Amino acid sequence: MGEIEGTYRVLQTAGMRLGAQTPVGVSTLEPGQTLLPRMQEKHLHLRVKLLDNTMEIFDIEPKCDGQVLLTQVWKRLNLVECDYFGMEFQNTQSYWIWLEPMKPIIRQIRRPKNVVLRLAVKFFPPDPGQLQEEYTRYLFALQLKRDLLEERLTCADTTAALLTSHLLQSEIGDYDETLDREHLKVNEYLPGQQHCLEKILEFHQKHVGQTPAESDFQVLEIARKLEMYGIRFHMASDREGTKIQLAVSHMGVLVFQGTTKINTFNWSKVRKLSFKRKRFLIKLHPEVHGPYQDTLEFLLGSRDECKNFWKICVEYHTFFRLLDQPKPKAKAVFFSRGSSFRYSGRTQKQLVDYFKDSGMKRIPYERRHSKTHTSVRALTADLPKQSISFPEGLRTPASPSSANAFYSLSPSTLVPSGLPEFKDSSSSLTDPQVSYVKSPAAERRSGAVAGGPDTPSAQPLGPPALQPGPGLSTKSPQPSPSSRKSPLSLSPAFQVPLGPAEQGSSPLLSPVLSDAGGAGMDCEEPRHKRVPADEAYFIVKEILATERTYLKDLEVITVWFRSAVVKEDAMPATLMTLLFSNIDPIYEFHRGFLREVEQRLALWEGPSKAHTKGSHQRIGDILLRNMRQLKEFTSYFQRHDEVLTELEKATKRCKKLEAVYKEFELQKVCYLPLNTFLLKPIQRLLHYRLLLRRLCGHYSPGHHDYADCHDALKAITEVTTTLQHILIRLENLQKLTELQRDLVGIENLIAPGREFIREGCLHKLTKKGLQQRMFFLFSDMLLYTSKGVAGTSHFRIRGLLPLQGMLVEESDNEWSVPHCFTIYAAQKTIVVAASTRLEKEKWMLDLNSAIQAAKSGGDTAPALPGRTVCTRPPRSPNEVSLEQESEDDARGVRSSLEGHGQHRANTTMHVCWYRNTSVSRADHSAAVENQLSGYLLRKFKNSHGWQKLWVVFTNFCLFFYKTHQDDYPLASLPLLGYSVSIPREADGIHKDYVFKLQFKSHVYFFRAESKYTFERWMEVIQGASSSAGRAPSIVQDGPQPSSGLEGMVRGKEE
């Protein structure tokens, strides 16, 4: 049939058609026959287009999963934060699909030979500060460059020109008109960029001296504020047939009409996402759907498009909202319903924790355009701010936001000679439409080995030793320790200070902010944004800073605690509804308020032309509108009492919820007792009132912003007046709940009518001398306790004295013990000593007031709580109690509640114990207004360097973060007992706006940015420390555990 004689047609067997492998060693071919071409191929050659437009070839087995290819790409790029990225390709319908890691590639891509996959950013974080590596930020900048060119990142022409100018600065260095114009002729950044050419050049002139890393950061900072940042449209229509676009982001599912966002379904509102054929369904929580129907329906183009969008939503939700990946469900034996698709990478939380906890070593890299042109400042004036990496080992850490990232520059950049470039001919191809340059992947590989055997493959964290490279003298100037940036450095004993206390470490959480690593930061920045001198600007800035902290506090409940209870299915549905239906609306409101304040402050700090407009130098209109809206939330605030009560009851009834609750309180993100965060919404209202009073006091009645601020103050005062009694009741309930958990040996501490008055450390006279005890004064009784087993957070009840019939007398002369007084109770008499005369006066005043109140209360006093430990036989009323037992005896008795050997030691109870002081109910109430957040510079102890930290002051404690986006603090410093003052001449501090914190031998210096912020920090710290009182060391005849502890801390600090 037309076949040439002597040849044979090869017939496919059933096994060949099904893809079965031919047995090796036995040939079934006739002489002269060969295998089919597709049978000869043992590997697929996949082309991947990287973000710098270079092409790479990857060889993989045909049946391997997508993860194999992804792993090869990450390895070749040396990309550590790989979970932000993915591989995308176009299907036959020409829309982009993400390569699935857990699915075979040949089941996803029909013709792998003809498909070009491209590396792309998959998850866009809300803030570039969350990206840990400089290399990751560089890749993100390249992604935004691609989005600009493909018109995905739509924005105003001026903004597009500004972004392009920063990209130019990053790629070719400082402004040079001839070079700029030539570069822009060859490289396209914007569609029709000729129209914006002059504006791009004008902006580029202003970036002189800006390093590539700083330029990348500026690109990300500008882009993240745009509406279309990270948005990928999926065409759809609603039930009425209106054409819309769906998208997904870190906050939830978004709905657009054109380029206008018309709705946002936040993750906290969404109960379930599903699809059925072409219909995409969003099921809302019953308590939040409001005027909407329970389930919203959108129609996409096809089933595949619908399923693709659903998968992206699942991945975004898991990555940004969950603490870790959900456990895979067991497969059905016979039938399965629905998709088995799950996100298979690390969550953002896991990724950030991995970097913070693992001490990753950063690998240097080289930019694609680094050989074109280099900023002069990068080579000379600001060497520490721009890290220059030589293959021979010269490396200096620096970055706009990450001190551990590295930027590499090849020696050919410094010596523009005719040296040949390396070329990876084995695995690098060039797209005909792509400039032929060496990819960062190849450059990172070559950079790792170019130095030969003497070159270290990876530098340790911290300041590496500067090693001379070729052509560099060993006498080259080295950056001083104070001119290098670093993360917050802690001594080894306090490396994880906010999680559970480690066994063997000091129980007092007093961070030693040391110079470990030798890294510092010179606070003299060469360029500053324009800062208005008006005090109102700094008040608004305080509103913004404290609002950011407040939102983070709310997220402890709305995001982190919700995730914990949902994951374990530990909370009853009724309590879930009660809790989150009261917190979520408040959280959403404050998110919008924060956005408004951020935008207004950005205009306030903006260029002088925009700044001359009076509308930008005001905040009253925003405050008035939002303070009035807060009135509508009064009913939510009023139910927080019920929420707190029901949560406490549920934890007692449900052991699973109790376990999740306790476990969650040990997490770093829960830096205060969990129920404390339920008080934050009402406490925040008092803070608004305080700041509005400051604004009104600053403005004259004729000021254009005075009227709005005055009306806003009036509105918020009405709300706080209504809620004042609720806050008092809430604070008391929260404190009793906290004590019930931490005190062992007492039942039913929470009772109607019982009020907390004071807690603190006194020394009780026993036969063995003065023994340290923790005392708790309530409206009807006085408890005293001893510290439980070492390493636990519990105090064991040692005695309960009713206030009825109690008498308190001074007894300094009788016992020859300073600051002592005697407490006569109905069945017992004890002698106690305070640390100072001030402490003694506070205790005696509160005791006498409480005794008088209990006497006048009569029969209305609550029943005394029961004891769960054996009590001693009653003594004669005239007998003075001289206890036989000591702290060693106390360790012999241990309750089952003390099973949790880990605890958080920055609560007021533990700080009072170790600082030998006390705190009253009035002090706690005053601390509500003494809250502050903002950036401070902390001075290193052993150098002249300063380190920029985000600092939060709340609950008598300073919490330190690297940036305001961090989810949990790196360290904390309880301030009870500390004094705050201005440095003396002997301290050698020659800077403005510096204040000094001191407790015994522990001294810290912090520097504020302005006179106003300096005075505010001094005010709030003085208000907290003076109200609670400072406690110098006590002269004792007996043991002094607190002194020994401070000595241990001091020894570690030195």
Curated annotation (Swiss-Prot):
It holds the Pfam family RhoGEF. Residues 755-852, 929-1026 form the PH domain. Disulfide bonds: none annotated. One of its GO terms (biological process) is hair cycle process. SUPFAM superfamilies: DBL homology domain (DH-domain), PH domain-like, Second domain of FERM, Ubiquitin-like. Keywords: Guanine-nucleotide releasing factor, Phosphoprotein, Repeat. Residues 535-726 form the DH domain. The modification Phosphoserine is found at S389, S439. The keyword Phosphoprotein applies. Residues 421-527, 856-894, 1029-1054 are annotated as: Disordered. Residues 468-492 have a biased composition (Low complexity). One of its GO terms (cellular component) is cytosol. GO terms for molecular function: cytoskeletal protein binding; guanyl-nucleotide exchange factor activity. SMART domains: B41, FA, FERM_C, PH, RhoGEF. Coiled coil: none annotated. Residues 44-324 form the FERM domain. PANTHER family: FERM DOMAIN CONTAINING PROTEIN, FERM, ARHGEF AND PLECKSTRIN DOMAIN-CONTAINING PROTEIN 2. Functions as a guanine nucleotide exchange factor that activates RAC1. May have relatively low activity. Plays a role in the response to class 3 semaphorins and remodeling of the actin cytoskeleton. Plays a role in TNFSF11-mediated osteoclast differentiation, especially in podosome rearrangement and reorganization of the actin cytoskeleton. Regulates the activation of ITGB3, integrin signaling and cell adhesion. Interacts with PLXNA1. Interaction with PLXNA1 or PIP5K1C lowers its guanine nucleotide exchange activity. Dissociates from PLXNA1 when SEMA3A binds to the receptor. Interacts with PIP5K1C via its FERM domain. The interaction with PIP5K1C is enhanced by SEMA3A binding. Interacts with RAC1. Intramolecular interaction between the DH domain and the PH domains can stabilize the protein in an autoinhibited conformation. This is FERM, ARHGEF and pleckstrin domain-containing protein 2. It comes from Homo sapiens.
